[in-house]
């Protein structure tokens, strides 16, 4: 049996911004844009160090060689392709203070990414609170990507 790819997630570290956030591929298709925003919105609700406000849709020609952009062009339009960027040094907490990343906080982000997949695909156990160590509502403006024309 052949399975269809539904989502591609490329994970990178970065040194010039705090938090974790995503780059998504730009699209003019409103329905596809809304679908693309779902995974980052869910991760934002599951992870205190993820910033939906910093998440951007991007079609920068300099990024043509990235996995997200290359696979976005090669695969069917229904496949969501993301780059998850994670800071080398810190996230910003609800009081706008920098909180240094530790091995534990990186592991917590990984756990929250897994929980987000469970939420996205409505997998059994996704609502089980024993798996959820931290959730938040830090970002009040969840209406649009930071630079991509989604709303």
Model-derived features: positions:
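Structured catalytic-domain cores with a bias toward divalent-metal coordination
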Residues: 1-151
């Amino acid at each position: 049996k052949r399975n269809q790819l539904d989502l591609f997630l490329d994970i990178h570290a970065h040194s010039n911004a705090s938090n974790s956030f995503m780059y998504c591929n730009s699209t003019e298709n409103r329905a596809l844009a809304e679908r693309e925003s779902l995974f980052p919105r869910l991760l934002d609700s599951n992870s205190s160090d993820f910033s939906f406000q910093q998440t951007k849709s991007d079609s920068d020609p300099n990024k043509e060689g990235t996995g997200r952009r290359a696979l976005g062009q090669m695969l069917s339009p229904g496949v969501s392709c993301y780059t998850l960027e994670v800071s080398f040094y810190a996230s910003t907490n609800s009081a706008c203070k920098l909180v240094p990343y530790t091995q534990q906080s990186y592991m917590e982000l990984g756990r929250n990414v897994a929980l987000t997949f469970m939420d996205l695909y409505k997998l059994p156990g996704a609502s089980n609170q024993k798996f959820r160590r931290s959730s938040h509502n830090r970002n009040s403006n969840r209406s649009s990507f930071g630079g991509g024309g989604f709303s």
